[in-house]
A protein has these predicted regions:
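Membrane-embedded alpha-helical bundles that constitute the cytochrome b-like, heme-associated redox core
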Residues: 1-110
Length: 110
């Protein structure tokens, strides 16, 4: 988790710098901006890695909180399994969106 945490920090700070601090800031972010940005495999990979690492980091944090505060083994297992299922579902949906995003299928949006 330490290495992924460091990588997550680099990705998140890079995201904040590029998306919110450079240029005119967050006002420029719209569908067209994302479409142009995601035309590059570099930015798709960057955003996908940011999403995956954030989800893994968050799910691991929930697991640690559950292990610390939930005493009943059955409830602990239920909460952890629910967290894993939700996290996996979000990972699959996020991957589908990043991989299949095509602005040409949104007429009039760009």
């Amino acid at each position: 988790m330490r290495i992924s945490g460091l990588l997550l920090m680099v990705l998140a700070l890079g995201h904040l710098l590029v998306m919110h601090l450079m240029g005119t800031g967050a006002e420029r972010i719209n569908f067209g901006f994302v479409a142009v940005r995601w035309a590059s495999p570099f930015w798709r990979t960057w955003d996908w890695m940011l999403l995956m690492l954030a989800l893994v980091h968050g799910i691991n944090g929930l697991r640690n909180i559950t292990l610390d505060y939930v005493q009943r083994p059955g409830l602990r297992l239920t909460i952890n399994m629910l967290s894993y299922v939700i996290g996996f579902t979000l990972m699959v949906l996020g991957t589908i969106i990043v991989v299949t995003f095509d602005p040409s299928k949104w007429p009039g949006a760009v």
